[in-house]
Amino acid sequence: MAKGVAVLNSSEGVKGTIFFTHEGNGATTVTGTVSGLRPGLHGFHVHALGDNTNGCMSTGPHFNPDGKTHGAPEDANRHAGDLGNIIVGDDGTATFTITDSQIPLSGPNSIVGRAIVVHADPDDLGKGGHELSLSTGNAGGRVACGIIGLQG
């Protein structure tokens, strides 16, 4: 079993800790709490780069090793990093558990060293008809991010 963690921070006061657990060749379970967000849905994605030299803007596009278009987590045609939305309550906090088979912590498509990003707006899961739907889910700006590292 492999474990990972990402600590999210932002200049807007968004904070959180995300934990990743990967069992052998199975799915990865993502659990976390993020606070300081506007209530509602917020796009949640693994981005290709672990570079935060320019804040969340330098984390690159969604992690997409198979060259697919953006989609929902349950879609066959989706970026590996497309994790859908997290739901933020009236208190500005999201607590969530996501299980996904396309984000391993080892092997050629490992997400270790990449970034996890929370977006300002809901992810339309590639179905919104907007010009950005098939690339970003039209999820808006990047409000918080953290680099995924291995955890002992």
UniProtKB/Swiss-Prot annotation:
Residues that, per the record, bind Zn(2+): 62, 70, 79, 82
Gene3D superfamilies: Superoxide dismutase, copper/zinc binding domain
GO cellular component, one term: cytoplasm
Disulfide bonds: 56-145
Cofactor binding note: Binds 1 copper ion per subunit. Binds 1 zinc ion per subunit.
Subcellular location: Cytoplasm
Main localization of the protein described in the UniProt heading: cytoplasm
Record GO terms (molecular function): copper ion binding; superoxide dismutase activity
Cofactor requirements of the protein: Cu cation; Zn(2+)
Cited Pfam families: Sod_Cu
Leader peptide range in chain numbering: none
Key words, A-Z: Antioxidant, Copper, Cytoplasm, Disulfide bond, Metal-binding, Oxidoreductase, Zinc
Reaction equation(s) it catalyzes: 2 superoxide + 2 H(+) = H2O2 + O2
Chain positions recorded as Cu cation binding sites: 45, 47, 62, 119
Record-listed E.C. numbers: 1.15.1.1
PROSITE patterns given in the database record: SOD_CU_ZN_1, SOD_CU_ZN_2
Organism superkingdom: Eukaryota
Role this protein plays: Destroys radicals which are normally produced within the cells and which are toxic to biological systems.
Oligomer and partners: Homodimer.
Similarity-based family: Belongs to the Cu-Zn superoxide dismutase family.
Name used for this protein in its record: Superoxide dismutase [Cu-Zn]
Organism (species): Brassica oleracea var. capitata
Gene name, Swiss-Prot/TrEMBL: SODCC
